[in-house]
């Protein structure tokens, strides 16, 4: 595995790379963040995930690739914010990677295993429910919120 990681990072600034490797050794969550390529190399082996349709995916979705930004319409949005690894791939890949990051991140925060499992189930249930509606949600179009924002 170390050889694969070194090969992937070949040609990068040695000083910054040393810092990256040192940081990756600090926790499984940070290791996950720094090795998206390992995730993608191993995922195609899991054929069950390939049955899902292809879609544009973030490619490196994890807890720290979300953030807020202010749009031209003056609204602040919270969404994915890192698309360096975006790809046309199985629509399940981002879900799997995000769930792995939730498990690792919550372990670092010392959440009990039952709490982590519950959080992951809630994510999958909510995600499935939202997909079933067949539409994107935009908070500024959600009635009361829009009226409140317009008044302020």
For the regions a language model picked out, list residue spans one by one.
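Low-complexity, highly charged intrinsically disordered N-terminal segments
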Residues: 1-26, 30-33
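Short, surface-exposed helix-loop/turn micro-motifs enriched in polar/charged residues
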Residues: 31, 50-53, 58, 72, ...
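Charged/polar, solvent-exposed surface patches and flexible loops
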Residues: 3, 7, 34, 38-41, ...
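Catalytic activation segment of kinase domains across protein kinase-like and atypical kinase folds
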Residues: 51-58, 62-107, 126
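Active-site-adjacent bridging/hinge elements
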Residues: 6-15, 36, 68-77
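An alpha-helical support segment within catalytic cores of ATP-dependent transferases
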Residues: 21-54
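Internal, well-ordered alpha/beta segment that forms a basic, Gly-enriched binding/recognition surface
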Residues: 87-152
């Amino acid at each position: 595995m170390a050889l694969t990681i070194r090969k992937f990072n070949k040609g990068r600034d040695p000083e910054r790379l040393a810092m990256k490797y040192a940081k990756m050794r600090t926790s499984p969550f940070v290791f996950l963040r720094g090795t998206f390529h390992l995730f993608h190399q191993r995922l195609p082996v899991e054929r069950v995930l390939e049955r899902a349709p292809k879609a544009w995916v973030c490619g490196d979705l994890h807890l720290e690739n979300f953030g807020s930004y202010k749009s031209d319409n003056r609204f602040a949005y919270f969404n994915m914010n890192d698309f360096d690894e975006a790809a046309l791939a199985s629509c399940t890949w981002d879900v799997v990677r995000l769930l792995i990051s939730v498990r690792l991140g919550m372990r670092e925060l010392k959440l009990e295993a039952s709490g982590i499992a519950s959080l992951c189930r809630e994510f999958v249930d909510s995600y499935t429910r939202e997909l079933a509606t067949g539409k994107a949600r935009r908070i500024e179009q959600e009635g009361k919120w829009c009226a409140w924002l317009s008044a302020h």
